[in-house]
Regions:
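Short linear Ser/Thr-Pro motifs
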Residues: 16, 34, 73, 114, ...
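Phosphate-binding loop of NTP-binding sites
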Residues: 25, 62-65, 74-233
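Short, solvent-exposed coil/turn linker segments
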Residues: 1-2, 38, 42, 95, ...
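Cofactor-binding loop segments of dinucleotide-utilizing enzymes, especially the Rossmann-like FAD-
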Residues: 13, 35-36, 114, 142, ...
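Short, flexible coil/turn micro-motifs enriched in small/turn-prone residues
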Residues: 7, 12, 52, 108-111, ...
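N-terminal leader/targeting and accessory segments in enzymes
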Residues: 1-95, 99
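Beta-strand->loop->alpha-helix junctions that form or flank phosphate-binding loops
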Residues: 32-36, 55-58, 94-98, 138-140, ...
Length: 278
């Protein structure tokens, strides 16, 4: 994308919003950052000296009059009047995670779930580093620093492990090459409103995969057990016995077992092993 022609409004001045602002300014975009807090309540030092316009203390609808893309930080609700008005006007919505996936040159393992996603993300990263000490492995997303801050340093031969929350996923229109859902149980219903909406947000990590991609899913969770099938290839994991299809499980003696009917990558093996061990 030629960002030099784009006017981007970012809602939320926390770490995701400021990281995204720095990235977009570097790409040549015209950036406005808006936050409901006052300047003294925010840490905006990372944006000092950059050509960013600030609108603080409110999110006026007039921000949309000169807006080609509206980006939300992770904690910004999607039911705000300005977000609803952007949808009415047909202004695209995105966030730092979505723009990162759009531009990342390296394969990405994306991990989400109601529980265990941070541990699994960290473990997958460590396993990949141990497998090939000479290869750069980037771990981030909903943990650590926003990965978009590192985008200019990531090379095609690197590997990326990305934790993704439901807040990030609900605005994304791209799936990672390997997508893992540890489990789905009722959570964040104050944000999503219904369990069905929460499940739909989590499912978006899978929705844009191609037949060349992979999904790693729990056979023990009633929600994720229904998410295999069409699209990407599926690997299952279970602590209750051997899955009917390819995957990993813990046998009666407590040993980790893996069955794969086709060749897989170290990245896929790491994701499969980590989710069952977390």
């Amino acid at each position: 994308m030629d960002w030099s022609t784009q006017r981007v409004v970012i809602l939320g001045g926390a770490r995701q919003g400021t990281a995204l602002a720095r990235y977009l300014v570097a790409q040549g975009a015209q950036v406005t950052l808006s936050d409901l807090k006052a300047a003294h309540q925010l840490d905006l030092q990372l944006l000092a000296g950059l050509p960013v316009r600030f609108v603080l203390g409110e999110h006026p609808l007039s921000l949309l009059d000169e807006c080609d893309l509206l980006c939300l930080s992770g904690g910004v609700p999607t039911d705000l009047p300005i977000v609803q008005e952007a949808r009415r006007r047909g202004i695209p919505l995105s966030n730092d995670a979505g723009l990162f996936l759009d531009a990342c040159p390296a394969p990405v393992i994306g991990i989400t779930g109601s529980a265990g996603k941070t541990t699994t993300t960290t473990l997958v990263g460590e396993m990949l580093k141990a497998d090939n000490p000479g290869r750069a492995v980037w771990v981030g997303g909903n943990i650590g620093n926003p990965l978009i801050s590192d985008l200019d340093r990531i090379q095609p031969g690197d590997r990326v492990v990305m934790e993704l929350s439901s807040f990030q996923l609900e605005l994304m229109n791209r799936s990672p090459h390997i997508a893992c859902i540890t489990n789905i149980t009722p959570n964040h219903l104050d944000r999503h409103g219904t369990l069905e909406a929460y499940i739909a947000a989590k499912r978006r990590i899978l929705d844009f995969q191609s037949p060349d991609d992979w999904r790693v899913l729990s056979a023990d969770n009633s929600v994720t057990a229904a998410l295999g099938g069409e699209g990407a290839s599926t690997l299952w994991f279970s602590t209750r016995g051997r899955p009917a299809e390819d995957g990993a499980w813990v046998d009666e003696a407590g040993n980790l077992r893996v069955r794969l009917s086709r060749a897989s990558s170290p990245e896929l093996q790491a994701a499969e092993g980590a989710v069952i061990c977390h």
